[in-house]
Amino acid sequence: MVELKFLIAFFLAFTAGILAIKLGQALYDC
C-alpha cells in the first residue's frame, strides 16, 4: 500500500521536525 508508506514517511518527518525544533529551542535558551 503506497498510501500507508506515504503516511508513515510523513509522520516520521513531522515528528523529526518537532524534535529538531524543540532541540533547537533548548540549545538556544542555554
Swiss-Prot record:
| Keywords, sorted A to Z | Chloroplast, Membrane, Photosynthesis, Photosystem I, Plastid, Thylakoid, Transmembrane, Transmembrane helix
Q: Which GO terms describe its cellular component?
A: chloroplast thylakoid membrane; photosystem I
The lineage's top-level taxon is: Eukaryota
Q: Quick one: where is this thing mainly located?
A: plastid
Q: Where in the cell is it found?
A: Plastid, Chloroplast thylakoid membrane
Its membrane topology is listed as: Single-pass membrane protein
Q: Which InterPro entries match?
A: PSI_PsaM
Q: Where are the transmembrane segments?
A: 7-29
Q: Which GO terms describe its biological process?
A: photosynthesis
Which family is it part of? Belongs to the PsaM family.
What is the name of the protein in this document? Photosystem I reaction center subunit XII
Give the organism, scientific name. Answer: Pinus thunbergii (Japanese black pine)
Point out the gene that encodes the protein. Answer: psaM-A
